[in-house]
Amino acid sequence: MKENNKEQERFVAYITKQQCVNEAASVTDFLRKYAFRYHNSAFISSDPVQFPHRYHRKEDIEISGFLTAYLSFGARPQILKAAGRLDAVMQHNPLVYVLSKDWKSDFCGEESFYRTVSKNKMGELFHWLHGIYTKYGCMEAALMACQEGSPIQRLCRLW
């Protein structure tokens, strides 16, 4: 029994050593594989990630990406439809829309905007984004303002 445990320990040590040696190459290969698979126009055009990809300004990408991710539950065609509607409401200019406060009249009421997300909830998100973009200028700066905790924890503290 003890001999079997020693064999297992040697095997685990060997595998761990091999993983460390190959880690850099395997991570690179992993990232390249998925970049090739997902970072191409064929995939992007049929995925909700297409919305932030439409923009060039960092703030527009952040806002579009955040809101699209927030709505990304359910069937992909329905997500695309909701994200498309949201993009149209923002007149394809997320930062200007957030700063304009037009969302106060566009997103009020308890009726659903998408599935279980009410217009009021969308209004809360826009209110939160407005605070970030008026105080920090971009979400990245807001997250970097406090270095404590993970990015998700910092994002939650901003809420």
Give the predicted meaning of each segment.
Residues 1-159:
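HhH-family (HhH-GPD) DNA N-glycosylase catalytic core used in base-excision repair
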